[in-house]
Structure formats: structure tokens, C-alpha cells
Swiss-Prot record:
Its EC number is 2.7.2.8. It catalyses: N-acetyl-L-glutamate + ATP = N-acetyl-L-glutamyl 5-phosphate + ADP. This is Acetylglutamate kinase. The keyword DNA repair does not apply. NCBIfam families: argB. Keywords: Amino-acid biosynthesis, Arginine biosynthesis, ATP-binding, Cytoplasm, Kinase, Nucleotide-binding, Transferase. GO terms for biological process: arginine biosynthetic process via ornithine; L-arginine biosynthetic process. Belongs to the acetylglutamate kinase family. ArgB subfamily. The gene is argB. It is an enzyme of class 2 (transferase). Substrate binds at residues 68-69, 90, 195. SUPFAM superfamilies: Carbamate kinase-like.
């Protein structure tokens, strides 16, 4: 058999093996949080766009929520606006909020939409202000030390939390064969803008849509135990135990809580995926191996 025929046979074999997975997810909604290295490498960006288009082509409904922290930081630096963080959250005054909206809604969102469309998709770019897609309120942050009798309220500006999601809009787009691409900017009751963590927005969108999967692309191989081994499958009960014993801590804690809450809120499963791996999304959907950690509501044996 020639090399060309070998390659063709391998391609046919892969497609054939993917058939049961395609059948499983046809008509289902998958929410993907896009960020990290997958947004920076040209090769990975192209691969992501092709993966999203392929999902839609075989009848799966992807909904993309993206971040953009590094891009925001870059523009703030160029504008000589200093960045400040509290507990990992960007302090967002009115001037910074203008930059956040400009970068997320005007640059990053449209770049992703354009890339997907160039590869044959029909992506629509949105922020939370469009048809009040993401209704939000100001996030209250408190801090307390042993010396304090009452917690101190810390004002971090236009940082918000999700109050509600306009599922009518998203369902309309999905049924029209469009791919929604969402920037994590929320709108308040009086029209004010809020900067919201993209993981949290993705989780709330997945809950509201009762998605089959929430997929969070990261720069790590997955959730690891204390010895550094990747934990490929966990129940919600096991995740709670890993948080309690300190295995999950620091910067991973908010991401894992988001994944956990999504499953508890009705999402089929949440996945922490290594976005540095080419075609990571397809590997998770169409194979049993995967490239990260799956969190589901299954009972522990």
C-alpha cells in the first residue's frame, strides 16, 4: 500500500471511530471558554477555529465565551494606565472599563469571529450588552482580619457577577445555525458596564442553556493531585474533598468552583482541558482519551 493510501486509510479509520461520538452529541450544546495559550499561538488559533466549524458541521452546537486579560493588560500599559488586582480580579475604574470594552468587544471578539468565519463557520460576536445577554450586578468583595469586628468592603469598581442570561437570544442564534461568540461584559440594571471573569460567564451560560458540556481551555494538563499526576475523571463529591484537603488551591480554585457549580446547576459535565494541545476540543469530544480533567455528577463507586 502506498504512503498516500496509508494516510487515506488512517483518515477513514479515525472518521469511522468518531461516528458513535458524533451521534451522542448531535443537537447538543457545548459551551467552550476560550483563553490562555490557545488564543496566542497562530497554529492553535487556527486549530480552534477549525474545530469549532467542524463541530457545527456535524450537528453539534458550540457556544464560545472568550477571555482577553493579556490583551487588556497590553493596551493599558500602552496607554500608561496602571493595573491593580485584588484577589486575582482586575480593579476596574471607569477609564479601565472603557479599555476592557474596547479590547474584549472590539478587538478580541471580532478577531475570533473573523477567524471562525474564514474557516467556513457563521459566527456572531456579542457582548453582554446585546439584547441584555448577560445581566449583571456589582460584585461585592470583602476582607476581614482577626482584628476586625466587621468585614471591610473593598471597592474594585466595575467588576460584576452574573444575574441572568438571555437564553432566548442564544437559542435563536443556535437554531439559525450561527455560532455565538461572547465577550464577558455584563450590563447592569441602569445600563452600566461590568467586567466579569470569563470562566464564570461560561459557567452561567452553560447552566442557563442546560448544556451537555462546559469546556474550560487552560494552560495546564488538567487538575493534578499532590504528586503531580493528572486526575482524568472526578465526581462532584471528589472535587469537594480535594478542595477541603487543600489539593485544589490558589488560582485554580475559582476555575474549579465554576466547573463544579455548572455540573451542580444541570450541565452534563465540566472539563478542564489543556488548550496547548492541538485539536484539544475534538480529542475530548470524539475520543475516550481526552486531554484534561472531567467533572461529572456520577456517583462514586
Amino acid at each position: 500500500m502506498t504512503i498516500e493510501r496509508d494516510a487515506a486509510a488512517n483518515t477513514a479509520k479515525v472518521l469511522s471511530e468518531a461516528l458513535p461520538y458524533i451521534r451522542r452529541y448531535v443537537g447538543k450544546t457545548l459551551v467552550i471558554k476560550y483563553g490562555g495559550n490557545a488564543m496566542e499561538s497562530e497554529e492553535l488559533k487556527t486549530g480552534f477555529a477549525r474545530d469549532i466549524v467542524l463541530m457545527k458541521a456535524v450537528g453539534i452546537n458550540p457556544v464560545v465565551v472568550h477571555g482577553g486579560g493579556p490583551q487588556i493588560g497590553d493596551l493599558l500599559k500602552r496607554l500608561s494606565i496602571e493595573s491593580h488586582f485584588v484577589d486575582g480580579m482586575r480593579v476596574t475604574d471607569a477609564q479601565t472599563m472603557d479599555v476592557v470594552e474596547m479590547v474584549l468587544g472590539g478587538q478580541v471578539n471580532k478577531d475570533i469571529v473573523n477567524l471562525i468565519n474564514r474557516h467556513g463557520g457563521s459566527a456572531i460576536g456579542l457582548t453582554g450588552k446585546d439584547a441584555e445577554l448577560i445581566r449583571a450586578k456589582k460584585l461585592t468583595v470583602t476582607r476581614q482580619t482577626p482584628e476586625m469586628t466587621t468585614p471591610e468592603i473593598i471597592d474594585i469598581g466595575h467588576v460584576g457577577e452574573v444575574v441572568g442570561i438571555n437564553t432566548d437570544l442564544l437559542n435563536l442564534l443556535v437554531k439559525g445555525d450561527f455560532i455565538p461568540v461572547i465577550a464577558p461584559i455584563g450590563v447592569g440594571a441602569n445600563g452600566e458596564s461590568y467586567n466579569i471573569n470569563a470562566d464564570l460567564v461560561a459557567g452561567k451560560v452553560a447552566e442557563a442553556l442546560k448544556a451537555e458540556k462546559l469546556m474550560l481551555l487552560t494552560n495546564i494538563a488538567g487538575l493534578m493531585d499532590k504528586s503531580g499526576k493528572v486526575l482524568t475523571g472526578l465526581s462532584t463529591q471528589q472535587v469537594d474533598e480535594l478542595i477541603a484537603d487543600g489539593t485544589i488551591y490558589g488560582g485554580m480554585l475559582p476555575k474549579i468552583r465554576c466547573a463544579l457549580e455548572a455540573v451542580q446547576g444541570g450541565v452534563g459535565s465540566s472539563l478542564i482541558i489543556d488548550g496547548r494541545v492541538p485539536n484539544a476540543i475534538l480529542l475530548e469530544i470524539f475520543t475516550d482519551t481526552g486531554v484534561g480533567t472531567l467533572i461529572s455528577n456520577r456517583k462514586r463507586p
